Amino acid sequence: MTYCLIPMTLPEINNLLGANFVNTFQTEMDLIIAPLRKYIAKGYPLALGKEQWEYVVSESIPNAEWCGAGKSIIDVKIGSIGIDVKGVSKEETSTSTTEASMFQSFKEETKLYFNKKDTESIWNLFVDGWLSKVKSVDEYYLIGIVREKETLNCSLCAFKVADTNLLYEDDLCKFTKKSMKVSGLADSAFIETRVYSSKTRLEIKFKSKVWQDPNYALPIYKF
């Protein structure tokens, strides 16, 4: 099967982000973390907003421009390249990360579609909606910043577009009690995607292979 998103190797990631990305990211994050170390040492949990990850990524890439805050699907722009930044976390024994939003719809029909188990309408609204936004970007990339809850160290994974012609098939959709699991966007060994009824949005989780395999995981921050 041809997936929409495929994982990038470390050479590809370094080529996208630049040779000095890791060093600059470490420096930028230290500036954010330094005032918080007192509280972290006392056991307070570290909480960083979505935009802070975007700011640091933007500041760590030469000639990059931040364009997040819900203005478009991308958060960081480098010329015609658009980067969608997802900040997530995991525990030591996790098999997947926390979730991040990919696409949200506030249409009232969403709950009706779930009640009727109407997989095609849910797909058309969320998956096709997300694909439409991806197609609007000349060169789209999705990056995940995975923070370890125990150590606060971070690694980065990235995905590039391989195919935007993914079509609805009933067997790509599977209902659980509160969500519809969507297959086909990426290999399930790397990414899990679901549409949640209560949140009315398509969400992504990164799977353990993406941070365990050194071919795909780039260490970017050491606490």
Predicted regions and their residues:
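Nucleic-acid endonuclease domains
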Residues: 2-73, 77-81, 87-223
